[in-house]
Design a protein with these regions (language model features):
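Phosphate/pyrophosphate-binding active-site segments
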Residues: 1-2, 294-389, 508-585
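N-terminal cofactor/phosphate-binding cores enriched in small/glycine residues
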Residues: 5-73, 79-81
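Active-site diphosphate/adenylate-binding microenvironment
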Residues: 8-16, 26-30, 34-39, 350-429, ...
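Glycine-rich phosphate/diphosphate-binding loops that line cofactor/substrate pockets in enzymes
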Residues: 11-20, 62-67, 155-160, 199-212, ...
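Structural signature of the thiamine diphosphate
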Residues: 22, 65-74, 80-82, 90-97, ...
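Glycine-rich, anion-gripping cofactor-binding loops and their flanking helix/strand elements
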Residues: 82, 216-304, 400-428, 442-445, ...
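Glycine-rich, acidic loop regions that bind phosphate or pyrophosphate groups
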Residues: 100-149, 243-349, 451, 473
């Protein structure tokens, strides 16, 4: 019989799946739920040693002798401190010791609670990985607990062996921690990592998947090897490859697609319609908001990640395999093992939805400006964008696959886009372009103090505020929005550039913009800054209108009762009233 405490169930299940059976136990209350659950499980071999210092050294010797991971389990507070000497020894000698340290409620720390010290990462510098596991109260806690324990156990022998710490929090409800009322231990998700693998067996899994979705994150495929490997992969498997512009995969293959605004307009019903059996991801950050829907609505999906450093990235909450290698090597190896063919059924599901995406006639706004700008970008241009609207809208609008797109989307900060762009531009002979907002430019204005090359082209959209906050809230919801939240201002960038090394241009409407862009993309003696003036609230409304125009049903797809009600409301109220209600309701 096992405890019903979820975090302990997850821990026990993963210890069994990682084949970690030896546990050296010291007495205590906090670890009672764990100890009582494993002592009658024939899988585990338990040893009782009262003194924690001695127990840890005993486990050290056992692990060294058997060349397998060995756990030590103790109660909270100073009991855990007694593990220090053996943990340090294990770290220096590369021995797989697992410190299972039970802990108190963290909210009570330093508030006169008995036996309560700071145990989180207490062995810092002496362990390869330390995780702090909360008590599981909801699905998010469960996912986090599962992920953290997987990460710790995977690190035991990743690029060399060594000790890890799993610190888990327990209540002091004596009845709860001493109740064992679960007959069958629930099996939790295990994550496997491969530095080398049997690609034939991996291919056998892939070929049985009917709906395979490959997702490409930010990346730069300089040689084209990844593109070529993906092209062959799409021919052999029932898959779709989705890459935003920042994946920089230049291919005319129709099965390698940019979902553009789909993540912002897709419904729960459509997520179910497009739900994959398996996701294979590569690259860094994937910007499309599709990634937020998959954990919520795609309940039957498995995720494999390809990443060179082997780091765990469980962004879709369903990661089961990590392949520590270059993505082109993975796909090439799979291609060599495969003789299948894409039946295109899953591809046509995506194509049917993407073919419905369109730009309606746009009022003059930042979306209209960015669309026009992207349309005139030359082939092979280098484009750097700031975060949020610049990334989002350029991803909607860029149609030339050879445009190289970059942005600081790792930490997604507003502050350093200009400096990053100027650094990139130094090594380029052709014109290089920056798409930036007014606040982002002001953040980084001192970057313009250096001498600039004539190939610099900066298009700044000045809507006198942070447009993202107008999209999120709007003046109807927060009338004082521009005072502080959106940082409203009356600054014209022209005033910062007069007398500088720039050739300055400006536009206030579409006709002027088209005229200025003709000169903007031509070589010149000086760098050029083009300032385009829009209005923040109008920009937000234009984006919302674009989203609503593209919230359409897929022909022949079953829709939920909730979706049907929304459709009727929109028809009765009209688009303008419906949109207002949709974006202002709490």
């Amino acid at each position: 019989m096992y405890t019903h405490i979820k975090s302990v169930q997850i821990l026990i299940s993963l210890l069994k799946q990682f084949n970690i059976r030896h546990i050296v136990i010291s007495p205590g209350t906090r670890n009672t739920a764990l100890v009582g659950s494993i002592e009658n499980d024939v899988f585990f071999k338990c040893y009782s040693i009262v003194d924690e210092r001695s127990a840890a050294y005993f486990a050290l010797g056992l692990s060294e002798s058997l060349d397998v991971p060995v756990c030590v389990s103790c109660t909270a507070a100073t009991a855990t401190c007694n593990y220090f000497p053996a943990i340090k020894e294990a770290y220096e000698r590369k021995i797989q010791l697992v410190a299972l340290t039970a802990d108190q409620n963290p909210y009570e720390m330093f508030h006169m609670e008995d036996q309560c010290i700071d145990q989180v990462d207490m062995f810092h510098g002496y362990v390869k990985k330390a995780v702090d596991v909360p008590k599981v109260m909801n699905d998010s806690d469960y996912w986090y607990c599962n992920r953290c324990i997987n990460e710790a156990l995977l690190e035991l022998n990743h690029h060399g062996k060594g000790p890890v710490q799993i610190n888990y929090h327990m209540s002091y409800n004596l009845n709860e921690i001493s109740t064992y009322d679960v007959k069958k231990l629930p099996i939790t998700r295990k994550i496997d990592r491969y530095e080398v693998c049997d690609f034939k067996s991996i291919e056998n899994i892939i070929k049985n998947k009917k709906r395979l979705l490959v997702i490409g994150g930010s990346n730069f495929d300089k040689t084209g090897k990844l593109r070529d490997a993906l092209n062959r992969f799409t021919e052999k498997h029932n898959c779709v490859v989705i890459c935003d512009t920042y994946a920089n995969i230049y291919s005319e293959n129709e099965k390698i697609i940019n979902p553009r605004a789909l993540g912002d307009v897709i419904t729960q019903d459509q997520i179910s319609y497009l739900e994959p059996d398996l996701i294979i991801s590569f690259g860094a950050i994937y910007y499309s908001t599709i990634k937020y829907f998959i954990p919520c609505y795609a309940k039957n999906t498995e995720h494999w990640q390809i990443v060179e450093d082997g780091m765990i990235n469980d962004g879709y909450h369903c990661l089961t395999k990590v392949f520590e290698m270059r993505p082109e090597d993975f796909f090439n190896q799979i291609n060599q093992c495969s003789n299948g063919m894409n039946n295109e059924e899953y591809f046509h599901c995506w194509k049917k939805r993407l073919d419905m995406m369109h730009f309606q006639k746009l009022e003059f706004s930042n979306l209209a400006v960015i669309r026009e700008f992207c349309n005139v970008l030359p082939d092979n241009a280098l484009l750097h964008t700031t975060v949020l609207d610049s990334i989002r809208m350029s991803n909607y609008a860029i149609t030339k696959p050879t445009v190289r797109c970059f942005a600081n989307i790792g930490a997604d900060g507003i502050d350093g886009a200009l400096s990053t762009y100027l650094g990139q531009g130094i090594g380029e002979e052709e014109l290089v372009y920056l798409l930036i907002g007014d606040l982002s430019l002001m953040y980084d204005m001192n970057a313009l103090l250096q001498k600039l090359n004539s190939n610099i082209r900066i298009l700044v959209i000045n809507n006198y505020a942070g447009a993202e906050f107008h999209k999120n809230f709007g003046l109807e919801r927060i009338p004082t929005l521009n005072n502080y939240v959106a940082a409203g201002h009356n600054i014209k960038i022209a005033n910062c550039c007069i007398g500088s090394q720039f050739e300055y241009m400006m536009a206030t409407n579409m006709e002027e913009l088209k005229d200025r862009l003709k000169e903007f993309i031509k070589p010149s003696q000086k760098p050029i800054l083009l300032e385009v003036f829009t209005e923040a609230d109008s920009d937000a409304n234009a984006l919302k209108a674009y989203w609503n125009e593209n919230r359409e049903e897929i022909p022949g797809m079953k829709i939920s009762a909730k979706a049907k009600i929304k459709k009727v409301m929109k028809k009765i109220l009209g688009s303008n009233v419906y949109n207002c209600l949709l974006y202002t309701s709490p």
